[in-house]
Amino acid sequence: MSEKYVVTWDMLQIHARKLASRLLPADQWKGIIAVSRGGLVPAGILARELGIRYVDTVCIASYNHDNQGELKVLKRAEGDGEGFIVIDDLVDTGGTAKAIREMYPKAHFVTIFAKPAGRPLVDDYEVDIPQGTWIEQPWDMAVTFVAPLSAK
């Protein structure tokens, strides 16, 4: 990955709320399925904004911080996804998205961020990201002290 796109908590909240506004009316949904781990925080925001209390998870391991590896389903939510929103933070190459589509063919699959290779696999997303860009999510970062330039 050549570029980095840093996401702050504020940015994530704004993007998730914009996405939630397009998922109204909320009474059309039975619940939300969060793709663990990237979809957990966005799912919480969507659940709040839409007033949805039923939130389940599908647990898929594919990344080890900045390396994408073999896809492994650790836990899945029951059903075919009918009436459910499935949320992940990002669709990248489409590996996870293809697995989600197979497991939940009737779900409405959304992400906050989408790269070109994965875009056709989601029903909606909020932010376009170039394919070669690595996204730094706020839950993967910490605020640290940086010395002033004059002190170096």
Swiss-Prot record:
Gene3D superfamilies: 3.40.50.2020
Binding positions for Mg(2+) per the UniProt entry: 89
UniProt-annotated location(s): Cell inner membrane
Cofactor: Mg(2+)
Segments crossing the lipid bilayer: none
Binding site for 5-phospho-alpha-D-ribose 1-diphosphate: 37-38, 88-96
Keyword S-adenosyl-L-methionine (UniProt): no
UniProt entry tagged with the keyword Cell division: no
Residues given in the record as xanthine binding sites: 92, 135
Uppermost EC category: transferase
Pathway where it operates: Purine metabolism; GMP biosynthesis via salvage pathway; GMP from guanine: step 1/1; Purine metabolism; XMP biosynthesis via salvage pathway; XMP from xanthine: step 1/1
Residues involved in guanine binding: 92, 135
Catalytic activity: GMP + diphosphate = guanine + 5-phospho-alpha-D-ribose 1-diphosphate; XMP + diphosphate = xanthine + 5-phospho-alpha-D-ribose 1-diphosphate; IMP + diphosphate = hypoxanthine + 5-phospho-alpha-D-ribose 1-diphosphate
PROSITE patterns, A to Z: PUR_PYR_PR_TRANSFER
Protein keywords: Cell inner membrane, Cell membrane, Glycosyltransferase, Magnesium, Membrane, Metal-binding, Purine salvage, Transferase
Topology of the protein relative to the lipid bilayer: Peripheral membrane protein
Chain sites annotated for binding GMP: 92-96, 134-135
UniProt EC number: 2.4.2.-, 2.4.2.22
Gene Ontology biological process: GMP salvage; IMP salvage; purine ribonucleoside salvage; XMP salvage
PANTHER family: XANTHINE PHOSPHORIBOSYLTRANSFERASE, XANTHINE-GUANINE PHOSPHORIBOSYLTRANSFERASE
NCBIfam families xref list: PRK09177.1
Family: Belongs to the purine/pyrimidine phosphoribosyltransferase family. XGPT subfamily.
Protein name (record): Xanthine-guanine phosphoribosyltransferase
